[in-house]
Amino acid sequence: MTKGILGRKIGMTQVFAENGDLIPVTVIEATPNVVLQKKTIEKDGYEAIQLGFEDISEKRANKPQIGHAAKANTAPKRFIREIRGANIDEYEVGQEVKVDIFAEGDIVDVTGISKGKGFQGAIKRHGQSRGPMAHGSRYHRRPGSMGAIAPNRVFKSKELPGRMGGQRVTIQNLKIVKVDPERNLLLIKGNVPGPRKGLVIVKSAVKAKAK
């Protein structure tokens, strides 16, 4: 069954494996999450657990948020997300979910909001090739042809300049290198989406290969 937790991306560092290999890892701080609600097929049409992460003061929360958190005997939360596919019988409302639900060697999917890059050209945004940079060339970094004359329009899939980044991105099949329950840290091999301090969701991998 699926396991999941919410956390914040702290940054990247390096650790050594037992065989001496240097492994680049991303550090994720996941302070204890609280189960705010259990979604059931009978009542909601699907099964999921609703997790709350990071307390906020009641002054910054509205009455529905305060009341919803009170049912779980906890403070209002800054972030609330659902984890589908979890075995809801293993969870109770008000229960804390900590990093020790994962173990070293587990394969996970990490979801976050990618870094916003603003308005970018086709070369940076789509990886297109640039034109000749010589003095005689009049074509350097433009998108190129918009298409043939006949359709009298630009096709929908044409790669053009525009807003880049700031989108929900999931990187699959990342390996957990280390779990530190005392400091609420997960060390995950490779990079994960988003800026430092950005919210990330760590879940059991959907497409993990069987051992």
From Swiss-Prot:
Q: What GO molecular-function term can you cite, just one?
A: rRNA binding
Any one Gene Ontology biological process term?
translation
| UniProt KW RNA-binding keyword | yes
Query: Which Gene3D superfamilies does the record match to this protein?
Result: 3.30.160.810, Translation factors
Instruction: Provide this UniProt record's keywords sorted from A to Z.
Output: Ribonucleoprotein, Ribosomal protein, RNA-binding, rRNA-binding
Region annotated Disordered, chain positions? 122-147
- One GO CC annotation, please? cytosolic large ribosomal subunit
InterPro entries referenced in this protein's UniProt entry, alphabetically: Ribosomal_uL3, Ribosomal_uL3_bac/org-type, Ribosomal_uL3_CS, Transl_B-barrel_sf
User: According to its UniProt entry, what is the function of this protein?
Assistant: One of the primary rRNA binding proteins, it binds directly near the 3'-end of the 23S rRNA, where it nucleates assembly of the 50S subunit.
**What is known about its subunit structure?**
Part of the 50S ribosomal subunit. Forms a cluster with proteins L14 and L19.
Similarity comment: Belongs to the universal ribosomal protein uL3 family.
Q: What is this protein called?
A: Large ribosomal subunit protein uL3
Please name the source species: Geobacillus sp. (strain WCH70)
Gene name?
rplC
